[in-house]
Amino acid sequence: MPKMKTHSGAKKRFKLTGTGKLKRQQANRRHYLEHKSSRLTRRLAGDKLVFKGDAKVIKKMLGV
């Protein structure tokens, strides 16, 4: 059986923490920030953890 390939899109979007959880960036903070409030852009600043159910699928894509 051949090796599983890592999903390139998932590889770019998610990072694995030391404890095995997955980190992701929030959407809506790339461009067109002029019309978005400062409050919103600050709120979207930090990374978030991926929910358990989603993490299972993403880990499979990453080959973890």
Swiss-Prot record:
InterPro entries from the UniProt entry: Ribosomal_bL35, Ribosomal_bL35-like, Ribosomal_bL35_CS, Ribosomal_bL35_sf
Gene Ontology molecular-function annotations: structural constituent of ribosome
Ribosomal protein recorded as keyword: yes
Gene3D superfamilies given in the database record: 4.10.410.60
BP terms from Gene Ontology: translation
Family the UniProt entry places it in: Belongs to the bacterial ribosomal protein bL35 family.
Disordered: annotated segments: 1-31
GO cellular component: cytosolic large ribosomal subunit
Keyword Ribonucleoprotein appears in the UniProt entry: yes
Cited SUPFAM superfamilies: L35p-like
Keywords: Ribonucleoprotein, Ribosomal protein
Protein's organism: Paenarthrobacter aurescens (strain TC1)
Descriptive protein name: Large ribosomal subunit protein bL35
